Regions:
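Catalytic metal-binding/acid-base residues of hydrolase active sites
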Residues: 48-50, 235-237, 284-286, 330, ...
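Active-site gating/metal-coordination segments in enzymes
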Residues: 147-303
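Active-site neighborhood of phospho(di)ester-bond hydrolases with catalytic His/Asp-centered motifs
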Residues: 43-45, 154, 191-193, 233, ...
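Histidine-centered catalytic micro-motifs
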Residues: 42-54, 280-284, 326
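Well-ordered, non-membrane alpha-helical segments in soluble/globular domains
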Residues: 109-140, 165-180, 206-221, 254-268, ...
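Acidic (Asp/Glu)-rich catalytic clusters
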Residues: 139-146, 174-187, 218-228, 274, ...
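Catalytic pocket-lining loop regions of alpha/beta-barrel enzymes
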Residues: 58, 65-67, 246-419
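Mid-to-C-terminal alpha-helical segments outside catalytic/metal-binding sites
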Residues: 3-41, 45, 57-116, 122, ...
Length: 495
């Protein structure tokens, strides 16, 4: 969007007083009554509000779920992926449509909550979210989780590795999300997505174009410095590591440009460390794009906790300055589920008991990898417990609580590094149990750090810290008041 148009919107937003942004929850009359705030800060450090237009759906379905290139006339998997892609794009509002809606809200022509409440939204998880306006997804999150002070949604950029192209570019995502940050009164501030392959391809086409507003690095830097974003999102399972990408040469599905990634990522990390910009990375061994099909051990679990630890060992200047959230902390909920299955199998002498034992051993190795890396770099590496939606029985919830409490007792440093997140978990029936499950899994004296204090330290939200200063400037630019959660952050013990 051009600068003059953006300035006009800022003046208009300030002129109408942004009243809806000052008290957003009270305006959601169509939702259940807002309960009292908990006695601790609550930050959802890992969530999503994007829709189908932001994701290369066909490529994602091909590579992640079906592990096919999508090539070939008779490729049935590709046909199915294209159908899913078509349905998602058909139902999701286009970028221009939503941009016009957001601009009409910013200029006071439309009340966002009236528009939201007059539409029937299924809130049925991923599929419903994929077809909604992004603003509606944000308002739904606020209604489902009214206790949450700050939501930190992550954008996505997987096009280059998936051999497909989303309908919305990363730059368009950034511009649209800025409006949502303003309209929600600072309840949302996100991570801008970055893909090193996109930058490498851009540099090949425009070797002298780093200063262009179209440069991927320039887009994410501007997003953080000027547009209300608080960090950077990386998705290594697409086919890259934080360091040592030359070792991926020859792995199945890896782009031949992989050896060039290190220089691009080094530039990004240097900037993040200097400006105190946090990074969130998908670190769970899941959602990989074919690379794991290779037999070479170097191809396994790209972006693992160990590889992030190696980054700090190779670049000690990053320690304490470049903070990274290792997303999905080893899926400890699945480990609890598999442990119970193994106990049942051994008690009943089931024939699959040996297979379950091997699976449980592999699961515990993944959790151990997170713990070891976080122990080695306690001021740099964090992790979130997000998308833990498998805790669907009382027995499993108790097992998860037992496992987590024992884990934290054995590794006390985790209490200062684990953070709360929801990821995709958006169903109304699951919202309250999800929060309760997380609370039950941790000792009461660690609730404050887990739900807010650790995230505030990771993001740099306290008064005088870099992210806080950038957000204060962002609110001044748009002429809106500082959010209430500023005071809650400053009054929360560091943990």
């Amino acid at each position: 969007m051009d600068t003059k148009r953006r300035q006009l919107l800022r003046f208009a937003a300030a002129g109408v007083g942004m009243g809806f942004a000052a008290s957003p929850l009270e305006a959601l009359a169509c939702r259940p009554t807002t309960p009292a705030k908990p006695n601790h800060l609550l930050i959802d450090v890992h969530c999503h509000i994007f829709n189908a237009d932001d994701l290369a759906v066909r490529g994602f379905a091909n590579h992640i779920f079906m592990h096919t290139s999508g090539r070939g006339v008779l490729n049935i998997g590709n046909w199915l992926s294209q159908m899913v892609d078509w349905l998602g794009q058909l139902s999701a509002p286009g970028i221009r449509t939503e941009t016009r809606l957001l601009e009409s809200i910013l200029t006071g022509q439309v009340d966002p909550y009236d528009a939201y409440c007059r539409v029937e939204h299924p809130h049925g998880g991923i599929l419903a979210q994929a077809s909604n306006y992004r603003l509606h997804n944000a308002l739904a999150m606020m209604a489902l989780y009214p206790e949450t002070d700050l939501f930190v949604p992550a954008m996505v950029d997987m096009d280059a590795h998936l051999g497909d192209q989303a309908l919305v570019t990363p730059r368009q995502q950034v511009d649209l999300m800025e409006y949502i940050f303003v309209i929600t009164g600072g309840r949302f501030h996100g991570y801008a997505a970055f893909d090193p392959l996109r930058q490498v391809r851009y540099d090949e086409k425009r070797p002298n174009g780093r200063d262009s507003p179209l440069s991927p690095l320039r887009i994410v830097k501007r997003a953080v410095m000027e547009q209300g974003f608080v960090g950077i999102k990386l998705y290594p399972p697409m086919g890259f590591r934080p360091i040592g990408n030359a070792a991926l040469d020859g792995c199945k599905g890896i782009n031949p440009r992989a050896p060039k990634y290190d220089a691009v990522l080094r530039e990004l990390f240097d900037w993040c460390a200097a400006e105190r910009v946090p990074v969130i990375t998908h670190c769970n061994d899941s959602n990989h794009a074919n690379v794991h099909d290779s037999e070479n051990s170097e191809c396994q679990h790209v972006g693992s906790p160990r590889q992030w630890a190696q980054l700090y060992e190779s670049h000690p200047e990053y320690r304490g300055h470049l903070k990274v959230d290792l997303g999905h902390f080893g899926r400890a909920d699945m480990h609890s589920r598999n442990r119970l299955k193994l106990l049942d199998a051994e008690r009943e002498n089931w024939p699959n008991a040996p297979d379950l034992a091997r699976q449980h051993a592999e699961d515990m190795k993944e959790a151990a990898g997170f713990i070891a890396a976080m122990a080695a770099h306690p001021e740099s590496l964090f992790a979130d417990l997000s998308n833990y939606d498998t805790l669907d029985t009382d027995r499993l919830r108790k097992a998860f609580s037992k496992d987590m409490r024992e884990m934290i007792a054995a590794h006390p440093h985790l209490a200062r590094q684990l953070m709360y997140g929801t990821d995709w978990f958006m169903t109304p029936q699951g919202a309250v149990p999800y929060l309760d499950n997380m609370r039950d899994a941790l000792p009461p004296d660690r609730h404050g750090p887990f739900y807010g204090a650790n995230a505030a330290r990771f993001l740099g939200l306290r008064r005088g810290e870099a992210t806080r200063r950038r957000l204060e400037a962002f609110y001044r630019k748009w002429g809106i008041a500082d959010p209430d959660w500023f005071q809650r952050v400053d009054s929360t013990p560091a943990g």
